[in-house]
Amino acid sequence: MKIGIIGAMEEEVTLLRDKIENCQTLSLGGCEIYTGQLNGTDVALLKSGIGKVAAALGATLLLERCKPDVIINTGSAGGLAPSLKVGDIVVSDEARYHDADVTAFGYEYGQLPGCPAGFKADDNLIAAAESCIAELNLNAVRGLIVSGDAFINGSVGLAKIRHNFPNAIAVEMEATAIAHVCHNFSVPFVVVRAISDVADQQSHLSFDEFLAVAAKQSTIMVETLVQKLARG
């Protein structure tokens, strides 16, 4: 099995990259792909860049060049579920765009023409992630993760997301674009991220302060998940 892992920022991939044995780097289209073995398992780690276009471009390059069997999207996210705090884990059962609006033509809010309203994560990957969470004794929430090209740190943006997606557990800027590409390529995916802020008016400050905490937690989680998937 070859496992694809995608993070947007240097801080979100550096700890994993440092663990890759026989690491080789491919720079392409503004992205970097690191290939090798993580604890003996073939992996391809992508640093995509921030935002939906960068994530979609990177995910497409990763799938075309490296042919991974599954995709794990890792990194940080803003917490929306009331029980979440910095360092907690969120696992997607679905991903949706929070900034797409074609409702004038009868589509659901967040749905693009020709696409499902939401992109469902793979049940087996979700189950494996939840098993890892129990094994590591981490605080975690599973549910809807929403994505858009905005860092949410104000009451207006937050209120709009809560109105349109009252069940959303977290918000970030890449996951749904990655899920969209995986859907088009029929490759199973799951989003496993750690909370860096709680998407409020101080989130830009807490993000800077706690990004390292989120990166460490998500790295531990992803490394454990890779090992579990490799064992079957």
Swiss-Prot record:
Pathway connected to this protein: Amino-acid biosynthesis; L-methionine biosynthesis via salvage pathway; S-methyl-5-thio-alpha-D-ribose 1-phosphate from S-methyl-5'-thioadenosine (hydrolase route): step 1/2
Matching Pfam families: PNP_UDP_1 (PF01048)
Keywords carried by this UniProt record: Amino-acid biosynthesis, Hydrolase, Methionine biosynthesis
Family: Belongs to the PNP/UDP phosphorylase family. MtnN subfamily.
Subunit and interaction comment: Homodimer.
Function: Catalyzes the irreversible cleavage of the glycosidic bond in both 5'-methylthioadenosine (MTA) and S-adenosylhomocysteine (SAH/AdoHcy) to adenine and the corresponding thioribose, 5'-methylthioribose and S-ribosylhomocysteine, respectively. Also cleaves 5'-deoxyadenosine, a toxic by-product of radical S-adenosylmethionine (SAM) enzymes, into 5-deoxyribose and adenine. Thus, is required for in vivo function of the radical SAM enzymes biotin synthase and lipoic acid synthase, that are inhibited by 5'-deoxyadenosine accumulation.
Protein name in UniProt: 5'-methylthioadenosine/S-adenosylhomocysteine nucleosidase
Organism: Enterobacter sp. (strain 638)
